[in-house]
């Protein structure tokens, strides 16, 4: 087992999954400091969702239990913002949280610089940071695989869900015969990357996302995906029934 280590935390409502990517923009001093530290130290950060129900520490949103170690790729400045791509790698579990050196404050539309804020705590806490950190344990790779029949069925159901949403909002007008070949070309045969991409696309509930991240086996992850798609199908049927009844 990999020994525990301390990492910066990037806390947002949804989080990310391993082997997936997400373009992000930061403007807060705490996350600018975090990115500077990660670039200088060539280290990763922990991208993690906020805990549900919400709790805080020093005014900052507390993280959930499970997250994903990420590297910051394609970092660039755009005015006062930093743009980058979070590239998910391995999963982790939070063991202990290290608070930020300063409490949360509302700065309005104009943020102070990182250096100005560091001056407020550097004497009392020379090793402090503006961002939350955590002692974590990295989780091992998923055990096993999803067998082809089960995975192929999930890709078909996923395609049908995409078509159902498209039909409901009257978007592209694409049918199953249009969407399924695209999905099969992208996600067949089974790969762990495809499994996590499905999680990123399908799972929008806090409990489902945490359950997937905490899984030990690939079969447990696809259990979560199958249940989520079934719930979404029932929701779509209910919405369609209400619309037809009006």
Q: What kind of region is each of these model predictions?
A:
Residues 1-246:
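N-terminal low-complexity, acidic/polar interaction/targeting segments
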